[in-house]
Design a protein with these regions (language model features):
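Signature of alpha-helical transmembrane segments and their immediate interfacial
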Residues: 1-34, 424-426, 497-550, 607, ...
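Transmembrane alpha-helices and their membrane-interface boundaries in multi-pass membrane transporters
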Residues: 391-405, 426-446, 453-498, 605, ...
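C-terminal transmembrane helical bundles of large multi-pass transporters
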Residues: 318, 384, 632-1004, 1022
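Juxtamembrane segments of multi-pass membrane proteins
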Residues: 530-629, 633, 637-640
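Helix-loop junctions and hydrophobic alpha-helical segments within the transmembrane domains
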Residues: 322, 326, 402, 407-435, ...
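Membrane-proximal extracytoplasmic
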Residues: 1-334, 453, 655, 737, ...
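Interfacial segments of transmembrane alpha-helices in multi-pass membrane proteins
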Residues: 5-12, 29, 285-290, 323-380, ...
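Transmembrane helices with small-residue packing motifs
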Residues: 12, 19-55, 113-120, 165, ...
Length: 1022
């Protein structure tokens, strides 16, 4: 069936269908969810388990090892990496590809429930990783000096209000202090009564309860019975009578100081030097991030208006960045449409033709929005980037149909014939070129790992665009031409242009025909020239560095301050303030900062910079300058880097994992390799997870001595823990908020080792005994942190390259590892962001190979020939080499984005060759010789080839130059490589595709002649 003929004869039906698609497109565009990134589910999870007061070795033995054993028994687990530090075990789980992390988490909980972890150890917390949800929708800072009041304000007012917002999943609070009822025992008085912290803890638990007792009948009515003995005030806690072993009781307040006070600070936060509390708001999966972030801002404004005591600042809100990205993409799309219409006007000089293109492109784009809504895609950087990248491509099909219709009209054919036959003549080549372009996105969309998830939306939107462009080209374009085409005027204008403009264009056409004729008759030289071009282009790309994703200047610099073991949280916060002061002095582009110190061992500082257009330096340059400025700061380790999205998806540095059992040997190997890696030119932030041996007090109970006093090793350990750390005995509800009741010693035992040895340990008989009499109290050396990989101890060395060239750094590290002799049973291998990058590059390389194979399959099916696709695809090596040549020329790096552009080129640059070769074949079928067909067909196909190439290139120029905002920092590499590849391929197509055609044709005929000779010889034999 002739589609163009059907559409022209059913004008009303066709127009109503187009209008309906446009209306649905406008409606669904407003209903699409908006997000910064596609939903990226990383097949990984974290497990956290807290055991306050336990050292790294105790955590490893009592918590980490049992958890690891349980985790390794869950199906789908690929690897387990753990870190055992003071009071906490952190375990990272990597699943095999396509594992359902939610089901895996359920199985993990079942395994954990069956474990017997130590008393006082918290329940393991499982956190599945979703990259898009790791970035907060908003960060809110509550400011003020009274941190306890701020904590209550955050927990009772602000956080609940924000959590009620539709789309908010959670609100985390850090930097405040909790209120608690503290029961501090007087050691001497308690010992005089024979009281211990553990005994008082038991009494408090027994005296504070709400206990169901059963049911009674009141006549015919059945009533439930509850024993209510809940504590509700500090005085009630202080007035509890403690039974004595010798008989009688003593009031708790007589042997302990009972007070309502703030807990010890375990986190400190500040914003621009003002103390406060940081609230991080995370969106729910599938929620509209822009609406969620804007609702957070509106909610804070409403809360501040109602309560004048709420003082806040919002240093980060995702909607601002997303709106900029969306606006940038829409600007690029509109600019692409305008430029495409301009190209049509310049070549055809017809208002009707320009109007046809100007109408067909928006219809195609609106149709894509309908399909995005149906497929549940979001408006994110990748989907919008796909539309922006595809704007220049979608007009190609329409231009070829339009140009061919006008060519038929210029030759004197009537309007109906021109529209129907002009469309029919190019339908086969259009279908082939469209299918080849779509085919390359199939393996890309099915690629595993992060690359596949990142580019899935990108691939789908471009595939929708290109398929839609084919439908529009063979339906709407001929119909609009039928309405707008004046065939007699087109024919007359063609004759006039031939007379007036012939002299202006004839010289260029004569030059082209002369070169074409030369290469067609000197095939070897043509092949040598094309091979030389490939060699030159590839040689220029040898020093191009590789990165996972292009650098995106998001206007933030992150600083991590690592403190020595034993440091207090106040010391970490003070060091963060010092670094912030240095930043204020040395960074004029600084707009503000905030930091959080979550423990005494580290603090995280985030510097917000002014807008990119207002500064001369990039965020990376500023981070490097700050690294130099803080180099001499003593007492801590400081790392500075620009906030990078790529780091969230695997990092950008290089790591070396060293595994073995003996920690001393691991430390020796790590120290040697760390020194050698740090000496690599350009290596920065080189460090290892080797924890310095730090002093630790070890209490070893003497079981025989303990038994003489009726004590056990456990009762001694519990008494020491309660005296030093304190024990949460129970909770009391005050002002509708649960408050912990913590029983602890008076702090004297913490003052020195002698004081610890003198700690009175209560005995079951009512007396007490010094700790030193029943246990050995000594100082031993222990590692600060113990890291394990797949149940073996591991040390990791990590570093980065100052210029970002991790591939060169990895090459140097490989040389170091090759020359290093490891003891038996120990291994050292590359890991980190570099290996993640290479895995993704490998996946994309495989996708490129599969894409080329699919292009061949589609072309072979369309032309029913094994040879024709080879001729057309001879353009690919030169296009790839030319595209890569543009990277060092423009100072860009080879990234995943660049490789994706090569895959796109595999399906786009062949389009011009398809049009050219198909028309050469048609003319040969009409009886022309090979050379005649080439010299007649190529000049006639210059105009559509140049028009499609120019529209695609011009539509990509804003993206390549980053003219439309921050989003194009990521897509700029793709635009650059696409433009270079298309420029090179267009020139080569017009000059050398006929050469390849002749070479393959000669080889085919030569093979046929040999077969004929063999057949004739066989038949002539008697």
């Amino acid at each position: 069936m002739n589609i163009a003929k059907f559409c022209i004869r059913h004008k009303v039906t066709t127009l109503l269908a187009v209008i309906m698609i446009a209306v649905f497109g406008v409606v669904y565009t407003t209903q699409l969810q908006m997000a910064l990134l596609p939903n990226i589910e990383y097949p990984a999870a974290y497990v956290y388990c807290y055991y306050n007061g336990a050292g790294p070795e105790d955590i490893e033995q009592l918590v980490t090892r049992p958890l690891e054993s349980a985790i390794m028994s869950v199906p789908g687990v690929d690897s387990v990496t753990s870190s055992s530090a003071d009071s906490i075990s952190t375990i990272q789980i990597m699943y095999v590809e396509n594992t359902d992390v939610d089901i895996a988490a359920t199985k993990l909980r079942e395994k954990f429930d069956a474990l017997s972890l130590p008393d006082g150890c918290g329940s393991p917390v499982i956190l599945n990783i979703n990259v898009s949800e790791m970035m907060p929708s908003a960060i809110v800072g509550l400011l003020g000096d009274d941190l306890a009041a701020l904590q209550q304000q955050a927990e009772n007012v602000v956080a609940p209000a924000l959590e009620r917002i539709d789309g908010v999943a959670s609100v985390s609070v850090s930097g405040g202090v909790e209120r608690q009822i503290t029961v501090t025992l007087d050691a001497q008085r308690a010992a005089g009564y024979g009281l211990s912290t553990s005994y008082i803890t038991q009494i408090l638990q027994a005296e504070n309860l709400l206990y169901p007792a059963g049911e009674v009948y009141n006549g015919s009515q059945k009533l439930s019975v509850t024993t209510d003995a809940q504590l509700s005030t500090v005085d009630e806690v202080a007035n509890i009578n403690i039974p004595l072993q010798t008989g009688g009781t003593v009031r708790l307040g007589e042997v302990a100081n009972v007070a309502f006070e703030t807990s010890d600070r375990d986190a400190i936060a500040a914003m621009d030097g003002t103390p406060g509390i940081i609230l991080q708001v995370s969106k729910r999966s599938g929620a509209n991030e822009v609406k969620t972030a804007e609702a957070v801002v509106a909610a804070m404004e409403e809360l501040a208006a109602k309560d004048g005591s709420i003082h806040y600042a919002i240093p980060y809100v995702a909607s601002e960045y997303i709106n900029v990205a969306v606006d940038a993409a829409l600007e690029g799309i509109i600019l692409g449409v305008v430029l495409a219409a301009l190209v049509v006007w310049l070549f055809l000089r017809r208002g009707g033709a320009t109007m046809t293109i100007a109408v067909s492109m928006p219809v195609c784009i609106l149709a894509v929005f309908v399909l995005m809504y149906v497929c549940d895609l979001t408006l994110n950087m990748m989907s919008l980037g796909g539309i922006a990248m595809g704007v220049g491509m979608i007009v190609d099909n329409s231009i070829i149909v339009l140009e061919n219709i006008y060519r038929w009209a210029s030759e004197g054919h009537d309007r109906m014939t021109s529209c129907i036959e002009g469309t029919k003549e190019v339908t086969l080549s259009l279908t082939a070129s469209t299918l080849t372009t779509v085919a390359v996105f199939l393996p890309l969309g099915l690629t595993g790992g992060i690359a596949g998830q990142i580019f899935k939306d990108f691939c789908l939107t471009i595939a929708f665009l290109i398929l839609g462009s084919l439908a529009v080209a063979v339906t709407l374009v001929p119909l609009l031409c039928y309405f707008l085409l004046d065939e007699s005027k087109v024919h007359l204008d063609a004759l006039q242009r031939a007379q007036k403009g012939g002299r202006r264009t004839q010289k260029l056409m004569d030059w082209y025909v002369k070169k074409l004729d030369y290469y067609v008759h000197h095939l070897k030289r043509g092949v040598l020239v094309s091979v030389a071009l490939v060699a030159v282009f590839l040689a220029a790309c040898l020093n191009t560095k590789m990165v996972l994703l292009p650098e995106m200047d998001e206007g933030m610099v992150t600083v991590t301050v690592s403190m020595p073991i034993g440091s207090k949280v106040e010391q970490a916060a003070a060091m963060a303030e010092r670094v912030a002061a240095i930043a204020e002095e040395t960074i004029p582009e600084l707009a503000g900062y905030y930091y959080t110190a979550d423990s005494g061992q580290s603090a995280s500082l985030v510097l917000n910079l002014t807008d990119k257009g207002e500064r001369d330096r990039s965020a990376t340059d500023i981070a490097n300058a700050l690294r130099d400025a803080t180099y001499d700061v003593a007492g801590c380790e400081i790392t500075c880097s620009a906030y990078d999205m790529g780091a969230m998806m695997g990092g950008s540095g290089v790591s070396v994992n060293i595994t073995g059992e003996d920690y001393t040997t691991l430390k020796m190997i790590a120290d040697d390799l760390t020194a050698q890696i740090a000496a690599i030119p350009g290596a920065v932030d080189v460090s290892s997870t080797v924890a310095e041996q730090v002093p630790q007090v070890k209490v070893t109970a003497d079981r025989q001595a303990c038994s003489q006093y009726g004590l056990t090793a456990y009762s001694v350990a519990a008494a020491v823990r309660s005296g030093l750390t304190g024990t949460t005995a129970t909770t009391v509800t005050i002002d509708n908020k649960e408050v912990d009741v913590v029983v602890r010693g008076d702090g004297r035992a913490e003052e020195s080792l002698d004081a610890l040895r003198s700690m009175a340990i209560s005995t079951p008989t009512g007396g007490s005994v010094p700790l030193g009499s029943i246990a050995d109290v000594s100082v031993v050396m222990s590692p600060q942190t113990i890291t394990r990989y797949n149940q073996s101890r591991q040390v990791t060395i990590s570093g980065d390259a100052a210029d970002g060239d991790t591939s060169a750094m990895a090459k140097s590290i490989r040389a170091i590892l090759a020359g290093y002799t490891l003891p038996g049973g120990y291994t050292a291998e590359l890991a980190g962001g570099y290996t993640e990058m290479m895995e993704n590059f490998s996946d994309l390389g495989l996708a490129l190979i599969v894409s080329v194979g699919l292009v061949y399959f589609v072309l072979a099916s369309q032309f029913e020939s094994f040879v024709m696709p080879v001729i057309i695809m001879m353009i690919l090596p030169i296009a790839f080499a030319g595209a890569l040549f543009a990277l060092p020329l423009t100072g860009k790096d080879l990234s995943m984005i660049s490789l994706v552009s090569l895959i796109m080129l595999a399906g786009t640059v062949v389009n011009a060759s398809i049009v050219l070769v198909d028309y050469i074949k048609q003319r040969r079928d009409r009886g022309e010789t090979r050379e005649e067909a080439i010299l007649h067909a190529c000049p006639l196909r210059i105009r559509p080839v140049l028009m499609t190439t120019l529209t695609t290139i011009l539509a990509l120029v804003p993206t390549a130059l980053g003219m439309t905002g921050k989003m194009n920092e990521m897509m700029s590499d793709m635009g650059t490589t696409m433009i270079a590849g298309m420029l090179v391929s267009t020139v080569i197509t017009l000059l050398f595709t006929p050469v390849y055609y002749c070479v393959i044709d000669d080889l085919t005929h030569r093979r046929e002649r040999r077969k004929a000779k063999k057949l004739a010889a066989a038949q002539s034999e008697p």
